């Protein structure tokens, strides 16, 4: 079923010839009204020109009207030309939409170190037809993903729709993929930015597929106010629900993955320590490999936990896998075959109780398979 964007938003895409596959690869997301926006970008020191330009626009505090995305070319590590090409992409999109370039955010994803084919973008932008539906945009921004990622929620009459891409080179560092959330709620920019930081910390920053943080990743929230005011607490609960659903979709669609891993840590000294511990477990290559092999090797969970920096006493920790207690201050008797069968599910939950306080947090990951190696051996990054 088609997902309708919030009031005042339109989107569309085309095949510009950037992806060798010939699939859709150039997309626009547009607000008919100036929108307040909140933005989180990769902290990778080799960040792409689109990220540097986005940070400058964000610092200006001016409203945003549109996003132009190319998928297939990261426009990263392309020297001064890359910065000029990124500016040109914004100018071309602004010309197409009748806006100023300062109202247009750029985003690029794909192969690093290859000049951006601006001439293809120039030819492709006029071909994009804008509609009030999300699917064309969601499809066009994909690279090694196997499926589009769209989530939605409604809060007191206002709508929130999220679109994301991400499959590999996913690891927490401020933002971990391309994610675009749009809403017709009216939210003051200062409140929007503060709330978005908290949402990103709890959702997108808790996803890890392979431990690599991309050079191009961002998470964006636009609010154009077309519906009007809504209760802020309920609004951000809705935003977090959409972001969490997208984060889970990204982890489940990890390159070569066969299952989603959800790690829940409770009883931590602080919420931050709980999130850190959960991320460490979700990102452990040894545990991810055991997950793929349906091996309930709790020692790998404990080892990852010990490297997380979270405070705990190994003699008090409790580890539960798919509802089966494996460890509680020492070895517990359990049926390994039963635990292995439970790990064959499409979603596997690890629950860890540190018994240090009230802090709780989640992280999302996936298993590590031969297909991950194959995909990344064949795909130029």
Swiss-Prot record:
Q: Which reaction does it catalyse?
A: N(2)-acetyl-L-ornithine + L-glutamate = N-acetyl-L-glutamate + L-ornithine; L-glutamate + acetyl-CoA = N-acetyl-L-glutamate + CoA + H(+)
The disulfide bridges present are none
Biological processes annotated in GO: L-arginine biosynthetic process; ornithine biosynthetic process
Q: Cite the GO molecular-function annotations of the record.
A: glutamate N-acetyltransferase activity; L-glutamate N-acetyltransferase activity
Q: Which HAMAP family does the entry link to?
A: ArgJ
**Encoded by which gene?**
argJ
Q: Which residues form the active site?
A: 176
**At which positions is substrate bound?**
143, 165, 176, 255, 376, 381
- List site positions: Cleavage: 175-176
Organism for this UniProt entry = Thermus thermophilus (strain ATCC 27634 / DSM 579 / HB8)
- KW Ion transport (keyword) present: no
Protein's recorded name: Arginine biosynthesis bifunctional protein ArgJ
């Amino acid at each position: 079923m088609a997902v309708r964007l919030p009031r005042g938003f339109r989107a569309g895409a085309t095949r510009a010839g950037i992806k060798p596959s010939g699939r859709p690869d150039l997309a626009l997301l547009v607000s008919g009204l100036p929108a307040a926006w909140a933005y989180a970008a990769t902290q990778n020191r080799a960040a792409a020109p689109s990220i540097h330009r986005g940070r400058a626009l964000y610092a200006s505090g001016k409203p945003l009207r549109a996003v132009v995305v190319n998928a297939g070319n990261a426009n990263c590590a392309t020297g001064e030309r890359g910065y000029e090409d990124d500016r040109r992409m914004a100018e071309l999109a602004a010309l197409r939409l009748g806006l100023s370039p300062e109202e247009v955010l750029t985003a690029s994803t794909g192969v690093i170190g290859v000049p951006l084919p601006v001439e293809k973008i120039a030819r492709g932008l006029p071909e994009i037809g804008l509609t009030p539906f999300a699917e064309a945009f969601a499809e066009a921004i994909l690279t090694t993903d196997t499926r589009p990622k769209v989530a939605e929620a409604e809060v007191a009459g206002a709508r929130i729709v999220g679109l994301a891409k991400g499959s590999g080179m996913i690891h927490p560092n401020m933002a971990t993929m391309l994610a675009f959330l749009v809403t017709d709620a009216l939210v003051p920019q200062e409140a929007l930015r503060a709330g978005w930081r908290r949402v990103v910390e709890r959702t997108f920053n808790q996803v890890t597929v392979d431990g690599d943080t991309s050079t191009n990743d961002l998470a964006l929230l636009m609010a154009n106010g077309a519906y009007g005011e809504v209760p802020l607490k309920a609004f951000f609960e809705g935003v977090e629900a959409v972001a969490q659903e997208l984060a889970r979709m990204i982890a489940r669609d990890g390159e070569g993955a066969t299952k989603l891993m959800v790690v829940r840590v409770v009883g931590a000294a602080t919420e931050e320590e709980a999130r850190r511990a959960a991320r460490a477990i979700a990102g452990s290559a040894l545990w991810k490999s055991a997950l793929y092999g349906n091996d309930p090797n709790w020692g790998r969970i404990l080892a990852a936990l010990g490297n997380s920096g979270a405070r705990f006493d190994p003699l008090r920790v409790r580890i539960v896998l798919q509802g089966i207690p494996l460890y509680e201050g020492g070895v517990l008797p359990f049926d390994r075959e039963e635990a292995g069968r439970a790990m064959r599910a499409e979603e596997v939950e690890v629950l860890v109780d540190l018994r240090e306080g009230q802090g709780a947090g989640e992280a999302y990951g996936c298993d590590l398979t031969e297909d991950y190696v194959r995909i990344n051996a064949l795909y130029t990054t």
